[in-house]
Curated annotation (Swiss-Prot):
It holds the Pfam family Intron_maturas2. InterPro entries: Domain_X, Maturase_MatK, Maturase_MatK_N. Keywords: Chloroplast, mRNA processing, Plastid, RNA-binding, tRNA processing. The gene is matK. Transmembrane segments: none annotated. It is found in: Plastid, Chloroplast. This is Maturase K.
Amino acid sequence: MEEFQGYLELDRSQQHDFLYPLIFREYIYALAHDHGLNRSILLDNVGYDNKSSFLIIKRLISRMYQQNHLIISPNDSNQKKIGGYNKNLYCQMISEGFAVIVEIPFSLRLVSSLEGTEIVKSYNLRSIHSIFPFLEDKFSHLNYVSDVLIPYPIHLEILVQTLRYWAKDPSYLHLLRLFLHDYYNLNSLITKNKSIFSKSNPRLFLLLYNSYVCEYESILLFLRNQSSHLQFTSSWIFFERIHFYEKIKYPVEEVFANDFPAILWFFKDPFMHYVRYQGKSILASKDTPLLMNKWKYYLVNLWQCHFYVWSQPGRIYINQLSKHSLDFLGYLSSIRPNLSVVRSQMLENSFIMDNARKKFDTLVPIIPLIGSLAKVKFCNALGHPISKSTWADSSDFDIIDRFVRICRNLSHYYSGSSKKKSLYQIKYILRLSCVKTLARKHKSTVRTFLKRLGSKLLEEFFTEEEQILSLIFPRASSTLTRFYRGRIWYLDIFCINDLVNHE
């Protein structure tokens, strides 16, 4: 760790040019695996010491330089062993080592920002918790929304070239390119039927994908901020990237530098909002559908001409918020009119006025959730609870604890829903599935088991927010009911339960 800290304390101008030697430093892999330097960096099933294990990593890197990647052999993907060792294991180790090194330039910018020596240039970074205030405060004032699915798969060469803006070590990037080519052929990282954010994807690939998204957003948000009321004071951040792409013969210099004021006028919209979570983003505007279509075809051309990613206009849907719901962050969000009649009297004359207000609704997607529960055998396709047969061998405490944990996680996340009826249905399915699982284990009926256990089982399913609100408002039942029926956003809901799909 001291050696790693010493490297971080080197002169800032030299750090970007000497990333390649870190690949052959053992402490990098110790950091990647969260082990100390005096412990093994390999799994316990590898019966060799640290030096022997690290030598295998060096040999694997040397083999990458010796292979002829112009000739693709059908047997290359079947070469799982290197001298009797698991190639998948060592490729995963090298992948995590690459990820640690790739993060160094980003970490240095953060350290420089904290020290006040340099301003971080990533203006598009926001916390996920800012999405929920945006939905409540801004969404009801907007008219149209574009549901954008960021295209993938991405060619690995595009990911490496995008990284060149941050890591400027040619030797390191060349080795990374060879490794991705070899590892891609071995494990087929990018497939059409697998989500980029699935747990099977390594940390390195997610980091490369996020750098690609960051680069795409830096261009998109620059145009958006220039056309809004909150403009940047200068354009040097954007033109710094133009100078970078000009060196590698990218067409962005021709696209943006020739007629830059006209392009800004083309995207002029002071009410454009951009929000992204994982691989899905939304563009919302108060303006006409014409401008939304302009942004739509701009995004398609940006992906196809600049990032060489095939995309179709059909991947971007433009909907009117008053007529369609938006599926985002696991919620179904919509805007519905809330009509109220106000009677006003002035002297002897009275007037009846219709007051129409827009109300923002967040609903629990009951059908996808029931489909997710049916997929993991908590219920059938119609939503009727069934026993979880694979858990019947566990203890009663473990069975109840598993069901309660899933129920509380879902209830905790969907506490931001404006209507709780669908959430109550999901909780009912989980409760009855738990009872049926316990009854199956004890070879009893559900009715008999409930009579014997009483209400103690159902008390376990009380959600955490119900308990917290009952402590805050112990004597005001009406206040408790009003707060519980309303939306409650929690700051620890950045991770949705596994039952909710983002694919």
